[in-house]
Amino acid sequence: AHASDRDLTNFRREHVGFVFQFYNLIPSLTARENVALITELAPDPMEPEEALHLVGLSARMDHFPAQLSGGEQQRVAIARAIAKRPSVLLCDEPTGALDIRTGMVVLEAIEHINRELGTLTMVITHNAVIADMADRVLTLSDGHITHERRNPQRASVTSLAW
């Protein structure tokens, strides 16, 4: 089936949440305001407070990005992505710029979102350890799938061997 550029844009806007390696937060807006931006575009968004609660940032929602740690900023970015209740969540290197402990907090937040919202979550990473959390793992090389496997037993974040 072929879709127009407009149809694809509308699909992405309504059904896909993006979490980038670099958080792309607006420095002059609080965490709550950064999340609220996306809710203006979505047909049935959750309240920014609910999204921030889901990632464990209820107490930090009125802080500006410069007042947040790297892990907290990444969780604001996740909250912003999930506030529109996407059916697909794409995460590009969500732990790439974080230390191990903070990376684990971010992965736990993503895992929680996946469970709570039933969101199909795709994580793009160079960290092979994270693959043990997935139902299905695809390995890419030069833009092509070179290997595929399924995990019969998904690992929890706390059981990962960093």
Predicted regions and their residues:
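Conserved beta-strand-loop-alpha-helix hinge in the C-terminal portion
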Residues: 136, 144-162
